[in-house]
Curated annotation (Swiss-Prot):
Pfam families: Ribosomal_L32p
Protein's organism: Nocardia farcinica (strain IFM 10152)
Disulfide pairings: none
GO cellular component: large ribosomal subunit
Protein family per UniProt: Belongs to the bacterial ribosomal protein bL32 family.
Lineage of source species: Bacteria, Bacillati, Actinomycetota, Actinomycetes, Mycobacteriales
Protein name: Large ribosomal subunit protein bL32A
InterPro entries: Ribosomal_bL32 (IPR002677), Ribosomal_bL32_bact (IPR044957), Ribosomal_zn-bd (IPR011332)
Chain residue ranges for the region called Disordered: 1-21
Domain of life, source organism: Bacteria
GO biological processes: translation
Gene Ontology molecular function, alphabetical: structural constituent of ribosome
Keywords for the protein's UniProt record, in alphabetical order: Ribonucleoprotein, Ribosomal protein
Basic residues bias locations: 1-19
């Protein structure tokens, strides 16, 4: 296993870590025409409770 020979400076460490970015969550509009809320894909809509065109949970 590789082991660093020298300690990495604070500026080099921070410049390397500056490229780490959190990805924004992908949002879709609810396919239920009456709802139209933004929701995560492959998850039942939290506002109307539908998933793939059928009611799976109680509406809030």
């Amino acid at each position: 296993m590789a082991v660093p020979k020298r300690r990495m400076s604070r500026s080099n460490t921070r410049s390397r870590r500056s490229q780490w970015k959190a990805a924004a969550p992908t949002l879709i509009t609810c396919p239920n025409r009456a709802c139209g809320q933004k929701t995560l894909p492959h998850i039942a809509c939290p506002s109307c409770g539908t998933y793939k065109g059928r009611q799976v949970t109680a509406a809030v």
